[in-house]
Amino acid sequence: MTAFTQIEKSAAVPAPTDFGIEGMTCASCVRRVEKAISAVPGVASATVNLATERASVQFTGAPDTGGVLLAIEKAGYEPKVIIQEFGIEGMTCASCVSRVEKALRTVPGVADASVNLATEKGTVRFVSGVDVAAIEAAVRDAGYDVRKAKASGATAEPEDRRELETRTLKRLVILSAVLTLPLFLVEMGSHFMPGVHEWIMENIGMRHNLYIQFALATAVLFGPGLRFFRKGVPNLLRWTPDMNSLVVLGTTAAWGYSVVATFASGLLPSGTANVYYEAAAVIVTLILLGRYLEARAKGRTSQAIKRLLGLQPKTAFVAHGDEFVEIQISDVVVGDVIRIRPGEKIPVDGTVLDGNSYVDESMITGEPVPVQKAAGAEVVGGTINKNGSFTFRATKVGGDTLLAQIIKMVETAQGSKLPIQALVDKVTAWFVPAVILVAVLTFAAWYVFGPSPALTFALVNAVAVLIIACPCAMGLATPTSIMVGTGRAAELGILFRKGEALQSLREADVIALDKTGTLTKGRPELTDIVPADGFEADEVLSFVASLEALSEHPIAEAIVSAAKSRGIALVPATDFEATPGFGVRGAVSGLPVQVGADRAFSGVGIDVSPFVVEAERLGNSGKSPLYAAIDGRLAAIIAVSDPIKDTTPQAIKALHDLGLKVAMITGDNRRTADAIARQLGIDEVVAEVLPDGKVDAVKRLREGGRKVAFIGDGINDAPALTEADVGIAVGTGTDIAIESADVVLMSGDLIGVPKAIALSKATIRNIKQNLFWAFAYNVSLVPVAAGVLYPLNGTLLSPILAAAAMAMSSVFVLGNALRLRSVNPA
């Protein structure tokens, strides 16, 4: 083997792809990972290094990055993956989206890529060893410009760029119109106004008239219209035509034919030396006008994000010594003490140190009533202080603030693809090539079978087919509705963390609710304590509260609060043990103490039947009975009640009005749960459920093919939120519940659930309207442009009318999507 052959062969072998891996601790881990990766189809070899925590993988063909990542995860380790957002400029239709996604996925180390036409962004998931420059190069090689998007919530730069694009298009439209108008008047006036034709013949002459038309049309085509050529021609040469390519083919055909008719008319058959300069120019002008209107409409679709970005102030007054100094918000760090005066926006999240005021949190929660803030209260960046003044300590800054997280959630939802878009992706993959084929067949059919002059008919109809086809409308149909719908939801305090929830929420048949903190305020109150014979109420409460002081459960807080309000002193407890769903046990003053539900006592030989009548009475009144045992003897029955939220009855009624069944899942005993269900009109009750049994409860509700949306707020709700078809977290709940959810209600108000469902239905309905329009437009008008009506009634579609129709089709889709901004679900 020669050196040249060796070099040639080595060059043909693709470079290995590196994967970062976390969690390996020994050589056994290395072998396990190597074995898992080697089992992935297409992997030639895998070498794992424990010290560097990296795997070098050699593929036989195209890298299956996603397969390797999945294999690492299944082996029990965590691959190091980066998710980076890129801005992509120059996309005009769904074919562009498909092309960019395909280009990105061919980059070694890229696991997945999702591109959104409406936001002009691509989200790329790749392994840590991938050079970002390679990803950017792939986009540029596909024929588009790329830039790395900045951190979420940091800047409004994409909007500035969109405004610049809108202004540029406006200038191009004006320039193109100025050049096209005289051309249009001269050509059309000659046809419809005999006086104009005579004036041109006498003062300009036919030959000079053609030269003027040529000059004006050429200026339009290669001036304002040059943007179509810059994108369309390279894509044609790559055999990946897009909408720009259709415009280039159509206008160039009309212009080129006219040039031949002007300067070499002898090459054309007799009677066919007609010019179509005005058609080429008007097509460019109308399509530019459509792009301009489209750009303006796109800007309005992202108004929600712009408003969220505008909530954040630019500066903050931070304590430096004995004075407060104004600094840039980017310079604020955790721990800074910040002063807020009346009317000012709160710059970052924090905890109030001193002062008292009311804060307008409507832009975050959707609730119009200002919330009182005093020492110890949490404040959120972006909210507006009303009439008081206070200082607070910054706890979250930059991308960690709630506002930044909300913006990120909205952007993520806006950039997602719904299942309904799968058909669109399949169609748009072959749409443009199919249109070009139809145009070629149209030209051939008219040239062979058409009336005289056949060449003229063939050219005009083929150009009309190329121009009228509009893949843009199909590509924009879904993402624009998602953008506006999720943005409107954010304004109402409803965050769709996953775009798919927009579609799945409307399909829900059952709304399952956790009780505590969801139906109720989550702040239980001690209402009753009935001691057994030989015990005093305050004595029992002292033992019980001393034990419960070590628990973080809301019921424990209620018991401790009641003891303190009665002036009962607490003593240290030992041997504390909590069993979720049962209760707590420990020792107080050397005596064993146990507090919990009736099921907690059956296994320890303590009979709670003496309180059966009392338990029934308390349960029927909607209170939760608990039992207390001291030194192995039943000491008392205790009742706590968690007040129902004021808006819960209204929310349940609204869900019923939507035709939904409402179910409650609770750990309360059956009697208490049934009492609350009767009070609220809840259809189905799953009671006495242990925390880890909520998943099974959701599964039971799903029997028979029913779709279930589960609403919860606590840590123990997270598995059920994940199991449900749609998980809805109450925004006042725990972080883990919110992370597990598909939808977040920022206000913690259940009335947001019917609002979210109504928005889901409105958005999907809007998407279907857009898709129907986009498909119906192309399916019906492409044949008309080809001339199928000519044999019936002599109707042909002018390329100029085709351009106008195409330009307006995308504008119609965007305009329809913008209607979602005015949706106001009750």
UniProtKB/Swiss-Prot annotation:
Q: Where in the cell is it found?
A: Cell membrane
Tell me, which GO biological process terms does this entry list? copper ion homeostasis
Q: Which Gene3D superfamilies match?
A: 3.30.70.100, Calcium-transporting ATPase, cytoplasmic domain N (3.40.1110.10), Calcium-transporting ATPase, cytoplasmic transduction domain A (2.70.150.10), HAD superfamily/HAD-like (3.40.50.1000)
Name the positions where Cu cation 1 binds. Answer: 26, 29
Q: Which InterPro entries match?
A: ATPase_P-typ_cyto_dom_N, ATPase_P-typ_P_site, ATPase_P-typ_TM_dom_sf, ATPase_P-typ_transduc_dom_A_sf, HAD-like_sf, HAD_sf, Heavy-metal-associated_CS, HMA_Cu_ion-bd
Q: Which residues are the active-site ones?
A: 514
Keywords from the UniProt entry: ATP-binding, Cell membrane, Copper, Copper transport, Ion transport, Magnesium, Membrane, Metal-binding, Nucleotide-binding, Phosphoprotein, Plasmid, Repeat, Translocase, Transmembrane, Transmembrane helix, Transport
Enzyme class, spelled out? translocase
Q: Does the keyword Calcium apply?
A: no
Q: Name the positions where Mg(2+) binds.
A: 713, 717
Instruction: Name which cysteines form disulfide bonds.
Output: none
Instruction: Tell me which residues make up the HMA domain.
Output: 15-80, 82-147
Gene Ontology cellular-component terms for this entry are: plasma membrane
Q: What does this protein do?
A: Involved in copper transport.
- Would you identify the family this protein belongs to, as annotated? Belongs to the cation transport ATPase (P-type) (TC 3.A.3) family. Type IB subfamily.
Q: What is this protein called?
A: Copper-transporting ATPase 1
* Organism listed in the record: Rhizobium meliloti (strain 1021) (Ensifer meliloti)
Designated gene of the protein: actP1
